[in-house]
């Protein structure tokens, strides 16, 4: 089984200094691939997060120096985002629990699709599992996952998972949560 990488989502109610403290601890503890940041803090966090080796994705805003943008799924939104980032950047699209929106986003040029994995299904098959079995574009299991949720989520084969938002409490909590996730992922 391929181990999914970690996709962090920064809250909009913390300072850049606080976020960077948690982010640095998280990167030291596990395989963090990327961080989705609110447009309001993108300018301050992009360069330091990229220095940690992360792809920085701006939620709904212009990419600036970030690696990409994240939009709500929909052909027009994805197409506009694709134009904004050009060929060098990437576009992610949140499709929630909608197979239709996810497929539209993929067809419009999204580089990844974020899905709401809890309870969402297609013909009784969990939506993340369905996506992973029929599509090549990477999938982010977008709802935060706790350790106990991994047993249900991992067989669905997401490419990326979002850790618990509790990780943003402080650097120690971030390190603990990411370490526990990494250890559990490595034993699966």
Q: What would you call each of these model-derived segments?
A:
Residues 129-144, 161:
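Catalytic-face loop-and-helix region of soluble metabolic enzyme cores
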Residues 59, 94, 115-116, 142, ...:
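Generic beta-sheet signal
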Residues 86, 116, 123-135:
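Conserved catalytic cores of soluble enzyme domains
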Residues 1-75, 83-98, 102-110, 136-137, ...:
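Conserved N-terminal beta1-alpha1 strand-loop-helix module at the mouth
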Residues 79, 129, 151:
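Active-site phosphate/pyrophosphate- and oxyanion-stabilizing loops and adjacent acidic/basic residues
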Residues 20-21, 122-129, 177:
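Charged helix-capping and loop-helix junction motifs
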């Amino acid at each position: 089984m391929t181990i999914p990488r970690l996709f962090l989502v920064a809250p909009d109610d913390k300072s850049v200094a606080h976020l960077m403290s948690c982010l640095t601890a998280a990167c030291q503890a596990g395989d963090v691939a990327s961080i989705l940041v609110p447009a309001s803090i993108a300018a301050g966090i992009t360069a330091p997060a990229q220095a940690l080796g992360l792809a920085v994705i701006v939620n709904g805003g212009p990419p600036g120096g970030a690696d990409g943008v994240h939009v709500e799924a929909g052909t027009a939104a994805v197409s506009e985002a694709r134009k904004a980032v050009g060929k060098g950047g990437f576009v992610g699209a949140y499709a929630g629990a909608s197979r239709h929106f996810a497929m539209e986003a993929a067809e419009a040029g999204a580089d990844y699709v974020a899905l709401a994995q809890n309870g969402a299904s297609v013909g009784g098959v969990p939506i993340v599992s369905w996506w992973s079995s029929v599509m090549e574009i990477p999938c982010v299991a977008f709802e935060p996952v706790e350790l106990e949720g991994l047993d249900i989520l991992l067989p669905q084969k997401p490419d990326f998972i979002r850790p618990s938002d509790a990780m943003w409490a402080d650097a120690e909590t971030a390190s603990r949560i990411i370490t526990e996730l990494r250890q559990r992922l490595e034993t699966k």
